Every structure is written in structure tokens, then in C-alpha cells.
Amino acid sequence: MNSRRLGGLTAAALLSVGMSLGAGLAAADPGDYTVLLIDPNVVTGSLAYTAPPPVLNPGGQPGAMTIYTHRDGRTIADTVWVLGDPGAAAGAISSAQAATPVANSKTVSVPVGQNGQLVTGKSPDGTRSLSVLYFTEGNAAASLEFTGPAGDPVPQDLVVEFGQKQDALIKSQLGT
């Protein structure tokens, strides 16, 4: 499996989080969940981000995931899982948080979706800043991972704005 680095994580690690959710996740109706991913170019009003085609059903779980790369090297990994019920969504977030290594981490509640949590710190090797936003919305679970230079983390207000737009997109597409 390709193990492209995402700050403290790899794409393979993100996919394995999805796989580890396993039997606790009921299958949602099949569909093109890539419409649930928010494009950072829309949020920032720029064309500075590029992304490969999204991965449908990452780790075999219903949902979508992609990695946006800014021309300056910053990345945003956007993952949305669509699960059987809100309890499964909350469980997915717990599993994702447990699988995300953030050094010198600080966690704060943020006004995004249901139970929005922002974890900030550095990649385990200390070379990148890392901010990961987790939230649920109905039966959907979302993880947004922002990486950048170690001394220049993404501003919290931008993470919250991005998360709120991601939440609004989930609501509009899933009717939650």
C-alpha cells in the first residue's frame, strides 16, 4: 500500500483506522460519498490546493477521503465516514482519535457539528505542525487533518471555519 506521509500520519494509517472500525459499523446505502468532501479552494477563495481523485469507501467503510496539497506544501486530509447510526459515528471518532499520534497535544472543544474536538500539536518527529478536527453529524463522522511547517500551525479560526463548512455540506447532502 502506498504510504504517503501526512504529518504524523500516513494515508495507509488513515485507511487502517477505517478498517479497524470493522463490525461496529453498519453499511450505509451505497453511493458516491465523494460529494461530502469540502474543497479548501472553496473555503479559502483560491486555487492553491490540488488533490488526487478521492478514495471512495476508505478502509472498506462507507465514506470518502482525499488529501489536498497546497502549493506551499501544507496538506489537508479530509475523511468522512457514513455509518449506520450516530453511536457508530461517535465510535468511529474515538477510534480515529486513538490512532492519531500528535506530540505535545492540546485538545479543545470547538463549535463544529456534534462534539467537535480540535487536537493540536506536532507530528511525532516534530517536523510538522498538526491540527486535527473531529466531529460527528448524525450518522456521519469527519476527520480533518491539517499539516504545515513546525513553527507555523494553521490558525484555529481557519480550522473551525473549514469544519463548519464541512459540517454544512454533510447536512445538505445527507439531510441530517
Question: Where are each of the predicted segments found?
Answer:
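Short, surface-exposed beta-strand/loop micro-motifs that present aromatic residues
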Residues: 62-69, 129-137
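Surface-exposed amphipathic alpha-helical segments
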Residues: 149-176
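Short Gly/Thr-rich strand-loop-strand
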Residues: 37-58, 87-133, 168-176
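N-terminal export and membrane-targeting signals
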Residues: 1-13
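A short acidic-to-branched-hydrophobic micro-motif
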Residues: 65-93
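C-terminal region of N-terminal signal peptides and the immediate post-cleavage residues
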Residues: 6-7, 17-35
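A generic structural motif
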Residues: 83-87, 147-152
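Short, well-ordered beta-strand elements
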Residues: 77-78, 139-148
